[in-house]
Each structure stands twice: as structure tokens, then as C-alpha cells.
Amino acid sequence: MNPTCKKRMGAIRLETMKVVAQEAIAPAIFELVLEGEMVEAMRAGQFLHLRVPDDAHLLRRPISISSIDKVKKQCHLIYRIEGAGTAIFSTLSQGDTLDVMGPQGNGFDLSDLDNQSQVLLVGGGIGVPPLLEVAKELHARGVKVVTVLGFANKDAVILETDLTQYGQVFVTTDDGSYGIKGNVSVVINDLDSQFDAVYSCGAPGMMKYINQRFYDHPRAYLSLESRMACGMGACDACVLKVPESETVSQRVCEDGPVFRTGTVVL
């Protein structure tokens, strides 16, 4: 057995979680509510590795956590149907169960931020959900939250109303069918504010822009999406290169999914 895999297996948490509810919130995008003891260990920016309840699909699917309720022991996951596995997830309803591994990943660093702090959240498409818990937790501390969201079109817009509870929200669409026409850079490049921290998640093009725009920022973070196989750091399916190194690499599942800008090659 790979020694990395063996090391991780002792720390993996597996649980059969109960489906509390599920609904479609946009075309091919669903919000799934799960309940279980694992919720107590969850942090903003982490993800769960879900087993498809079908013997034909062996690999788990990584789904980011959008919000956490430790009192109810419930978490919300928002995902897009990308293939047969996630299509099966969309058929689940109240009372069903899921085999869950997690919580996985490092999550966002929300330390040392208070009512004197101002943060920028940047999300695109299905990368928006992980930012909801960040906004909720920081708003509760009195942190000023500014959010910029990017979508392909009006039909793809999600979580705008939810995020507006926690601060100012700008929405952009590629075709101009809703909000500001263009991508998130149209808004961000015009913002005069200095931000104590930046948290982002989205498509590769957006992440490259954030990485360049805030390259030297001491607290700018990228939550990266990647295809995964084992989810334990053993298979090297989600490896990223490190700047100025031919030998050192980072794994999205184990070392991420959150990385500080300038620390990985995009």
C-alpha cells in the first residue's frame, strides 16, 4: 500500500449521512441538505467525498460544503449535474442516505478578522457555494463583506439573495442578461477599497485572474476545483506544480483545496 494512503486511512472519517431535503435552484444545479455527526467537524471551504449509490460508479464525487449548521448537525451542498454520478445524486430525496467521506481539505483561514476588517469574496458559477459559509461566519463577527459573483447568464445566477444578507453583492454575467455585463474583473478593477483578506472560488480563468491580481497579497486565497480519484493524496490525480520548483508539488485534495495566491502554478 502507498505509505501516504496508509497514513491517511487512519484519519479518514466515514459516515452514512441522512438526506434531509433536496431541491433544484437553477438549471442542472441542486442544493442537497445532509444530516450527521460529521457536521461538527466541518469548516468553511472544506468538501465532502460522496459515494454514488450505484455499484457501476466506483469513484467518489467531491462536493463543496456551502453552509454548516452545527446545532442541527446539518450541512448544505450545492452541485451541478456533470455526468451520470451527479445525475444520480439529483434523484435523492428526504430519508435517503449517502456514504460520505470527510470533511476533506484544509478550508479557508478566517482567523484574526473582526469588526475593523474588510474582506472581498469572489465566486464564479458553481464555485460560489463555498463562499456562503465564509460570508455567514465573518458577518457574525462584524466583518465588512464585499462579494463579487460571475455567471454565464441570468439563468445561472445562484445564492445572490443569500449572500446579500451578509454584505454588498455585485453580480456579473458574460452576456449581460443580468447585473453587470462582463466578468468579475470589470467590478474588481474598479474597487477602491483595501481588503484585509480575499477569498475566491471559480473556474480556472477566474482563478488565474485572482492569482495575478492579488499575487503578493498576504491573505488572498484560491479554492481550486479538480477531478479526484482517491481523495486521500495517494493517487496524484489532482497535483499542482509549485512556482520555481521541479520536484515539489501540492495536491488539491490533501494540501488544498485552498491555497494562498502565488503558491501554486495555475
Where are these regions (language model features)?
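Ferredoxin-reductase
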Residues: 2-96
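Short, basic/aromatic-enriched C-terminal tail that caps enzymatic domains
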Residues: 13, 249-266
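FNR/FR-type flavoprotein reductase catalytic core
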Residues: 84-227
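Local cysteine-cluster metal-coordination motifs and their immediate loop/turn environment
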Residues: 204-205, 225-257
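Structural signal for conserved beta-strand scaffold positions within catalytic alpha/beta enzyme cores
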Residues: 21, 67, 171-173, 222-224, ...
